[in-house]
Curated annotation (Swiss-Prot):
Keywords: Cell cycle, Cell division, Cell membrane, Cell shape, Cell wall biogenesis/degradation, Magnesium, Membrane, Metal-binding, Peptidoglycan synthesis, Transferase, Transmembrane, Transmembrane helix
Record keyword Ribosomal protein present: no
Name of the protein: Phospho-N-acetylmuramoyl-pentapeptide-transferase
GO biological process terms held by the UniProt record: cell division; cell wall organization; peptidoglycan biosynthetic process; regulation of cell shape
Catalytic reaction(s) noted: UDP-N-acetyl-alpha-D-muramoyl-L-alanyl-gamma-D-glutamyl-L-lysyl-D-alanyl-D-alanine + di-trans,octa-cis-undecaprenyl phosphate = Mur2Ac(oyl-L-Ala-gamma-D-Glu-L-Lys-D-Ala-D-Ala)-di-trans,octa-cis-undecaprenyl diphosphate + UMP
A cellular component term, taken from the record's GO annotations: plasma membrane
Pathway(s) served: Cell wall biogenesis; peptidoglycan biosynthesis
Lineage of source species: Bacteria, Bacillati, Bacillota, Bacilli, Lactobacillales
Listed cofactors: Mg(2+)
Pfam family, one: MraY_sig1
Source organism: Streptococcus uberis (strain ATCC BAA-854 / 0140J)
Transmembrane segments: 3-23, 53-73, 78-98, 118-138, 143-163, 175-195, 200-220, 226-246, 251-271, 314-334
Enzyme Commission number(s): 2.7.8.13
Length: 335
């Protein structure tokens, strides 16, 4: 644990030291920022805010992880596990980088097409499967302590899990600080699980990324000086999925990641209901004021009768949901 604390602190300090230079470079080059939702008026002031900040914390976390892995985990299965998880983090980070690059530098509003993004995500999932899952001999999903063996079909679960949660965290990254601290809470929970399983290699990766995200949050809390971009959010979602697989606690991510699950579900429900009502009644109707769900909260809280919620209030509410759901998982596992 002491090793993890040192590695996490190094990651935090490096991110905090490098990020101001990244922001300054971004501003000097007058690079266009992330597009804002016009329906949420308080977001319009953020236009031009530097994005792609995930590039910094991903590179820092990867460098520190590889350094500590070589120094302390160079023998046995740990190196393979660390390599497998870092591989999918960097691959998904690269996918997000391409998406951000096309949007910002090439002024292509949609970035990668859905087919291009999904294809690259599947390739990334396959690389993780063959780097980590196959050598580990994993072919079963752990459902509340009971293994459900899937055999070769497990590959489809891995792809669904990694692609699904990478996109879920991406959808969650919509207001200042929300995704970064939500993922910190999730990683802290997996750190506890890793300690109980004596999986100190996974603990190291969690601690290093927690440090990097806390260093990033210094500049990402409201009012944000930088956003993580798809480069950060896609990588973080893939990392959470990979860690849940590595710890053989896949089901826990549905609860630990309740915020990501509900954010994604809100979008799917909204689109489906709108299409259904448009076909049935001739006009589309909505369940939520706006999706993902954090925008619904911004536009009137839970009841809709309240005044608009500030970003801090939305953050606090959803972070609390993430913390409580994580505690529920730990209680189920260890009490």
């Amino acid at each position: 644990m002491f090793l993890t604390l040192i590695a996490g602190l190094i990651s935090l300090l490096l991110t905090a030291l490098i990020m101001p230079h990244f922001i300054k470079f971004y501003q000097m080059k007058k690079i266009g920022g992330q597009q804002m939702h016009e329906d949420v008026k308080q977001h319009l002031a953020k236009a031009g805010t530097p994005t792609m900040g995930g590039t910094v914390f991903l590179l820092v976390a990867s460098f520190v992880s590889f350094l500590f892995a070589i120094l302390f985990f160079s023998h046995g299965k740990s190196m393979g596990l660390i390599t497998g998880i870092l591989a999918i983090v960097l691959i998904y980070g690269f996918i997000g980088f391409l998406d951000d690059f096309l949007k910002i530098f090439k002024q292509i509003n949609e970035g990668l097409t859905p087919i291009q993004k999904l294809s690259l995500q599947i390739v990334g999932g396959l690389i993780f499967y063959f780097l980590h899952v196959v050598p580990s001999g994993i072919d079963a999903i752990n459902v509340f302590g009971f293994p459900v063996h899937l055999g070769l079909l497990y590959i489809f679960f891995v792809l669904f899990w990694v692609v699904g949660f990478s996109n879920a965290v991406n959808l969650t990254d919509g207001i200042d600080g929300l995704a970064s601290i939500s993922v910190v809470i999730s990683l802290l929970t997996y750190s506890v699980i890793a300690i109980h399983q004596n999986q100190y290699d996974v603990l190291l990766l969690c601690g290093i990324m927690i440090g990097a995200l806390l260093g990033f949050f210094i500049f990402n809390h409201k009012p944000a000086k930088v956003f993580m971009g798809d480069v950060g959010s896609l990588a973080l979602g893939a990392m959470l999925a990979a860690i849940s697989i590595a710890l053989r606690q896949e089901w826990t991510l549905l609860v630990i990641g309740l915020v990501y699950v509900f954010e994604t579900s809100s979008v799917m429900l909204q689109v489906s209901y709108f299409k259904y009502t448009k076909k049935k009644f001739g006009e589309g109707r909505r369940i939520f004021r706006m999706t993902p769900f954090h925008h619904h909260l911004e536009l009137g809280g839970l009841s809709g009768k309240a005044e608009r919620w500030s970003e801090w209030k939305v953050d606090a509410f959803l972070w609390s949901v993430g913390a409580v759901s994580s505690l529920i998982v730990l209680a189920i596992l260890y009490l």
